[in-house]
Amino acid sequence: EGCDILLNREITSIDMDKLIVFCDKEKINGDLIISTISPDFLYKCCWGELAYVGRDFFKIVLPNEKVLPDDVYFIYYPNENEQQTRITECKKFTLHKSKNSLITMEVPSLKNKLYPTMIQSQLDLAEKYIKNLPEKIMSVGRMGTYRYVDIDDIIMQGLKFKEEL
């Protein structure tokens, strides 16, 4: 209530002093900007680009009612010798019933930006960007804060943030 939420827009630039967002050849003014994008984008990477790790997702349907044990939703493979990093049995999150199981296998990739690299120099750089944001620009979420945060924690952050506004 009292705000416009715009989805699926490509941001081309942001005037942080005037609180203007340019996207899809459109100029959007506001009195507050809540950003979920990487803070280096806001500053056009003036102090350097923040490093992220991505994932490629491979979907596999198996003719089994279940693949993983009942209380296991996903399995991590943190071993350097394993190419994939996680396998997830998707229907366990939705409680969907089926004689087949969809699993996803995640493989490290540089094609997209999903997870911040938890290297001190990168954390320091992110902190520099975030601390220099104008008072009326709030940076939230995994990319906005450059922290590895699970989706349930991000939702709780969003609800808390809404109450603080």
Task: State where each predicted segment sits.
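PAPS/PAP-binding and catalytic site of the sulfotransferase fold
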Residues: 1, 33, 158
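Short, well-ordered alpha-helix to beta-strand connector turns
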Residues: 2-3, 30-31, 134
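A conserved short coil-to-beta-strand element within the FAD-binding core of flavoproteins
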Residues: 5-23
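A structural signal for the hydrophobic beta-strands that form the central parallel beta-sheet
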Residues: 5-7, 35, 139
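Flexible, charged surface loops at secondary-structure boundaries
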Residues: 16, 27-29, 133
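Mid-domain catalytic core of redox enzymes
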Residues: 25-128
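C-terminal catalytic lobe of FAD-dependent flavoproteins
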Residues: 116-165
